[in-house]
Each structure stands twice: as C-alpha cells, then as structure tokens.
C-alpha cells in the first residue's frame, strides 16, 4: 500500500510573508485563527478565540487577500460565551443565497 504524501511549504523563516492579524500580549494569548477565502479571491474572513480556546470569538475581514485586516467586527452577543476554537465556512443554499457559518 502506498502512503499518501501531502506536499507542504514551510514559510516559517520567510518573515516578510508573515501578516499579523491580532497582536496578543504577554498576558493575552491570541491564536488558533481560521480563515475563509471568498470566491472573489481577495475578501477573507478570520475568526479566532480570545485566549486559548475562548472565551469569546473575534471576527475580522480583509479586502486584500489577507495583507491587511479590519478592526474586530460586530458579532452576536452569544459569541461572548464561546469556549472553543471557532471555524468559519461558506455555504450556498438551494435558494442560491450565500451564508457564512461560524462553529465553535
């Protein structure tokens, strides 16, 4: 049986390619971002928890394929109680309406 090989690209040393979405502090960890690239290939959304897995979820938007990011966007009040790492998905329903879903 052949093992599946998934190609990887390591850009960890190419710091000129790194983009800061949100700067944490020594007391506030901000990690586990999930991004979604929209079909126009320039609009992106990013969701991430405050702290290590919550509480609360932050949503930001980029209009230039992730080079720059908006300030945190308004989110529903119940996102303040999220206690996990969120993920964001795009679905187009049978009614052809595009919807974004955030799960945590």
Regions found by a protein language model. Give the residues of each.
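Asp-box/BNR beta-propeller blade signature and adjacent active/binding-site loops
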Residues: 1-104
């Amino acid at each position: 049986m052949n093992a599946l090989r998934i190609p990887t690209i390591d850009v960890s040393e190419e710091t000129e390619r790194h983009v800061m979405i949100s700067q944490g502090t020594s007391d506030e960890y901000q990690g586990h971002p999930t991004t979604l690239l929209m079909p126009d290939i320039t609009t992106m959304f990013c969701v991430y928890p405050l702290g290590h897995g919550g509480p609360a979820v932050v949503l930001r938007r980029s209009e230039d394929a992730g080079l720059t990011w908006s300030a945190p966007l308004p989110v529903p009040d119940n996102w303040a109680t999220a206690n996990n790492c969120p993920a964001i998905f795009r679905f187009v329903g049978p009614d052809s309406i595009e919807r974004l879903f955030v799960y945590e």
